[in-house]
Amino acid sequence: MSDWKSMSKDELELQYSPSRWSPRMSADDVIRAHVSALKSGTERARSVTQTLMDVPYGEAEGEKLDVYLPSSSSPDVPLVIYFHGGYWQFLSKDESGFLAVPLVQKGAVVVAVGYSIAPKGDMDLMVSQVRRSVVSVIQQYSHISGLYLCGHSAGAHLAAMVLSTDWTQYDVSPKIKGAFLVSGIYDLQPILSTYVNEPLKMTEEVALRNSPSRFLSQLKVSSASCDITVAVAQNDSPEFRKQSEEYYKALESAGLKVSFEDVSETDHFSIIEQLVDENYLLTKLLLKMIGKS
């Protein structure tokens, strides 16, 4: 496949427009259906689990978490932090509890993280926020059996940036046991000239310092024992698939514990929507990762 640098702006825009690659429905319809699926899944999770809503992890208005709790607490409770997608400019924690039910039913705590999406927040701020959210969670839940991250699309990018954090600056060491990176972007340079960057206003310098693909040595120091799954949809665009494949290969070459899942019969949206289903491949893999299969 040709290098993104040789693509026209139109081709890059197409490659980085996930909704235009779904075989299920039109671009507008797939986004509408996605939002609807996330909202209804989150409403269900809120109705069947115990919740703590809008827990602050910082001073800013957008710095809040939603926590989904199992009905009985046992000593070995894994905690899964979810970072939502939406190209850093859409969606929020308020539709991000949909994956909680199968996890909470097995005794896990699920935390959905809010962050200041563009144009309110910029990329540096969002990366700082998700890092601080993890610090706050470990301080609040020191008794957990393990901390795990899950992120979709832009959220997978943010999760990968968390894995690449120099924690000495935060006086903590989270010891993240596992990370589930679903249909993410790990090199931000290709989107600089696309519509995606219009509200983000990233310069090349900002894109480079927030590209996980450039921080493998830090990830190796911070997250050496982390079990990482890189997942991609069969009907993700070739560029999205390439982002996941190349990041997976780089992690593997760096000697990290990483596996690759190419999920058949999914697109960029259904690959994450189906986490509501305990029998879905990725749900089973996530439950296995957190020791609750």
Swiss-Prot record:
Motif (HGGXW): 84-88
A GO cellular component entry from the record: cytosol
Localization annotation: Cytoplasm, Cytosol; Nucleus
Xref: InterPro entries: AB_hydrolase_3, AB_hydrolase_fold, GDXG_lipolytic_enzyme, KFase_ver/fungi-typ
One GO term of the biological process aspect: 'de novo' NAD biosynthetic process from L-tryptophan
Family recorded in the similarity comment: Belongs to the kynurenine formamidase family.
Quaternary data: Homodimer.
Protein's name in the database: Kynurenine formamidase
Species: Danio rerio (Zebrafish)
Gene behind the chain: afmid
